[in-house]
Amino acid sequence: METSPISPMNEKNTAQPQQREENAQQILNTAIPFRQRSPGLLPEALKVGVRPDPANQIVETQEIEHPVAGFEGDSDQFQVSTNEMAEHLQASDLWYCPDGSFVKKIIVPGHGLDKPKLGSKCQVLALGFPFGSGMPEGWTELTIGIGQWREKMWGELMEKCLESMRQGEEAKIHLPGSSAPLAKLRLDSFTNGRDSWEMEAMEKEALAKEEHRRGTELFRAGNPQGAARCYGRALRLLLTLPPPGPPERTTLYANLAACQLLLGHPQLAAQSCDRVLEREPGHLKALYRRGVARAALGDLEKATADFKKVLAVDPKNRAAKEELGKVVIQGRKQDAGLARGLRKMFS
């Protein structure tokens, strides 16, 4: 994995203050675009039941001996000089969120192996979120996967950051393209939470409905990445229920397919549509979205079949008509190109 140059703790930095500041700026400016070059969620992250392991995303260096001055303790003392920040930027660990939405700079490493998960109650010190964002300031208790705080502007980002942290960890959140931190977090403690297999069926269904609702809100707000994350969480909960499972699974797979198409992953979208059509062969949205996915993959014959199935039930479906027309034109171009190639071969 590509990493940015990070100086060891035991190497004395003799650079002038201005040079150290420039070095620190360069570290974040070069590190952040590393993840930003891959827009959208990683394909693996969009598969149901597969989540990127945050432990694999961290660039490990030697353990930090001293936290950034002012973060530990009274929030009124939260003042760090530019030179101090520059030195710590060079020595800190950087963790890249798998979907490219932020970079976490670890100031004080946590301890233990456990991290918060669904249902974990986290004691958090949050500082620096923009005024009016609705995010908590100071000490607060947040529950992973539950609560209106997740619906705020920075709620999803904060939740993803907490899910990557260990007990006692202090970190700063940086947005792509910015060396100035958005906010600072300290995860003081958290309860264990529970894995899905430990929950009752009714509890799983209730949590899945909450994730479904949140995903739909994010999708309508133009955030297919966040929506896909919520739909995936809901499906992982429902997939642990005895078959055939609740009918909501069908809608979740169809919605997930829409997100995957917008994020440029037609293969995954086609697979999600297959799951829908296994349960409801006449599901028009799944047929249409699978047709779009197959067309993007170059499987024009199967794409045509899907669009024709939609039009057989709904002859006035304008979107299906338009996509079918595009597929027909694309097929004619392919046939013409093949004919030209054959003529050259036998001329």
Curated annotation (Swiss-Prot):
Keyword line: Phosphoprotein, Repeat, TPR repeat
Matches recorded under InterPro entries: FKBP4/5/8-like, TPR-like_helical_dom_sf, TPR_rpt
Residue spans of the TPR repeats: 208-241, 250-283, 284-317
Sequence segments annotated as region (Disordered): 1-24
A Pfam family it matches: TPR_16
BP-aspect Gene Ontology terms: regulation of angiogenesis; regulation of blood vessel branching
Subunit structure: Forms a ternary complex with CDKN1A/p21 and HSP90AB1/Hsp90.
Name of the featured protein: FK506-binding protein-like
